[in-house]
Amino acid sequence: MIPPADSLLKYDTPVLVSRNTEKRSPTARPLKVTIQQPGPSSTSPQPPKAKLPSTSCVPDPTKQAEEILNAILPPREWVEDTQLWIQQVSSTPSTRMDVVHLQEQLDLKLQQRQARETGICPVRRELYSQCFDELIREVTINCAERGLLLLRVRDEIHMTIAAYQTLYESSVAFGMRKALQAEQGKSDMERKITELETEKRDLERQVNEQKAKCEATEKRESERRQVEEKKHNEEIQFLKRTNQQLKAQLEGIIAPKK
């Protein structure tokens, strides 16, 4: 791990922790650590041992506030050059100037990291979360109850954001499915259009062939009709001439008898 980046949440000075990380229980609390000097032959004095709790039942307000702070805002740990460091949230009360400085730092970091003012912006969300954690820290030091209420507000906000993120991811997945379906439907429609255009050209070719056949048939029938009409006219003329001849012969036979 690398050292954590600068945060709007105020922390105490980092403490070098020496312990066997391989045998550490995964459920061990990072707060209960023993600070030791490297090397057994060091002449520096050993840190004082933790005092046993007094027999009095009255809890220490400062210790209680620190425990609440550590529960709300856990300490952060990192490894640097095979050395484990731990940094707890500061329990120093904040002044009005600290609040003003927090606002200035927030505005400055928003500008430096080029956070977007509108829309979805992970940078803006991260900085606002750090600022809100710092406000929770300041309020918790003065009043633990209000700090716990703000913690509930923060958790509700995180749950709401997580729900919106899940909804957004589901919407994106749904949109992608619909886009793929539309693309598939578009491909099917394009293929169907191509088939219909091919069928249309085939039908047009058949229509043209039938038109050509029809025109040829009409021309042939027209020629045949003309030939038949000419033949019929010749037969009519022949029959008329024959009729005139027979009529003349009949009149020639009948006329002398009178």
Curated annotation (Swiss-Prot):
Name this protein carries in UniProt: Axonemal dynein light intermediate polypeptide 1
Region (Disordered): 1-60, 202-231
Null allele phenotype: CRISPR-mediated knockout results in loss of sperm motility and fibrous sheath abnormalities with asymmetrical distribution of flagellar proteins in a majority of sperm. Nearly half of the knockout mice develop enlarged heads and hydrocephaly.
InterPro entries: Axonemal_dynein_light_chain
Coiled-coil stretches noted in the UniProt entry, renumbered to this chain: 176-255
One GO process term, biological-process aspect: sperm flagellum assembly
Quaternary structure and interacting proteins, as annotated: Interacts with CFAP45. Interacts with DYNC1H1.
Taxonomic lineage: Eukaryota, Metazoa, Chordata, Craniata, Vertebrata
Location relative to the cell: Cell projection, Cilium; Cell projection, Cilium, Flagellum; Dynein axonemal particle; Cytoplasm
Predominant localisation class: other
Keyword field: Cell projection, Cilium, Coiled coil, Cytoplasm, Dynein, Flagellum, Motor protein
GO molecular function, one term: dynein heavy chain binding
Pfam families to which the protein is assigned, alphabetical: Ax_dynein_light (PF10211)
Tissues with expression: Predominantly expressed in the testis, also detected at lower levels in several tissues expressing cilia. Strongly expressed in elongating spermatid cells (at protein level).
Leader sequence segment: none
Function: Involved in sperm flagellum assembly.
Gene Ontology CC entries for this record: 9+2 motile cilium; axoneme; ciliary base; cilium; cytoplasm; dynein axonemal particle; dynein complex; filopodium
Organism annotation: Mus musculus (Mouse)
Similarity comment: Belongs to the inner dynein arm light chain family.
